[in-house]
Amino acid sequence: MEPGNDTQISEFLLLGFSQEPGLQPFLFGLFLSMYLVTVLGNLLIILATISDSHLHTPMYFFLSNLSFADICVTSTTIPKMLMNIQTQNKVITYIACLMQMYFFILFAGFENFLLSVMAYDRFVAICHPLHYMVIMNPHLCGLLVLASWTMSALYSLLQILMVVRLSFCTALEIPHFFCELNQVIQLACSDSFLNHMVIYFTVALLGGGPLTGILYSYSKIISSIHAISSAQGKYKAFSTCASHLSVVSLFYGAILGVYLSSAATRNSHSSATASVMYTVVTPMLNPFIYSLRNKDIKRALGIHLLWGTMKGQFFKKCP
């Protein structure tokens, strides 16, 4: 088929991780378990933040938004992969592929911006503690989250519009478990040079900008902690941002690892395997990082579990 702007396609094939039939039940069980843990863990963080008045602070407001984004990122990719394994059908329609790309970029981009906002929140809390509640007022917090959603939505829309202009021929097999942007662009039989340039430019701008903000915030935080005289004061100050620093390291480290591994091996299946780190593993670990390191979250979750147990015992005794 000759490439051209009028080339019409209706579907792609998601090849997933392995073609071995014997591995499919194992992959289904593994990813279903990881997906359920991710959704449950992040839902508990959201419910604890909403229901406990002690957690109605800017830091936990941002954390609940991060948990929501984690649920959305995994829900964009994993259910479709599980359905494909269960039905032994690798087909995804062209429209569904575009929608999956749009929402994945939207939620992943939002996390990128939100982590920068959370770094700024920790910067204000440690470097300007007396003015923290004045600076991080509800209006500013809402505005920062709204701006993160808006920028991510516009970036995602730009990438989808760039894909729509491409023509596709007969090679419609995506060697991945979801419609990953680079993999889809590589299938195009029309010129995709502009697409790659837009990706490189926007990633450098919208990825490098927030990362620079995070590094700047933590440089100021480290300077402020270093100026504290007591060891207990230093530990208390550092503990307030340790969880966020762990999540940032995991998020950017996973993304960097994916692109370094794909550039080194040039193997699409290796890239798909590495992508599990930031699409599944990172969202799954985030609730554990925050709950294990945070006494307020553990207390709130403990109260809810205790209250749920007491209610269960009460209703069990009722005739």
From Swiss-Prot:
PROSITE patterns: G_PROTEIN_RECEP_F1_1, G_PROTEIN_RECEP_F1_2
Subcellular location, principal: membrane
Keyword Membrane appears in the UniProt entry: yes
GO cellular component terms attached to this protein's record: membrane; plasma membrane
UniProt name for this protein: Olfactory receptor 7A5
GO molecular function, one term: G protein-coupled receptor activity
Bilayer-crossing regions: 26-46, 55-75, 100-120, 140-160, 198-217, 238-258, 272-292
Family matches, as InterPro entries: GPCR_Rhodpsn, GPCR_Rhodpsn_7TM, Olfact_rcpt
Membrane topology recorded in Swiss-Prot or TrEMBL: Multi-pass membrane protein
Positions on the Cytoplasmic side per record topology: 47-54, 121-139, 218-237, 293-319
Keyword presence, Cell membrane: yes
Classification via SUPFAM superfamilies: Family A G protein-coupled receptor-like
Chain ranges on the Extracellular side, renumbered to this chain: 1-25, 76-99, 161-197, 259-271
Family: Belongs to the G-protein coupled receptor 1 family.
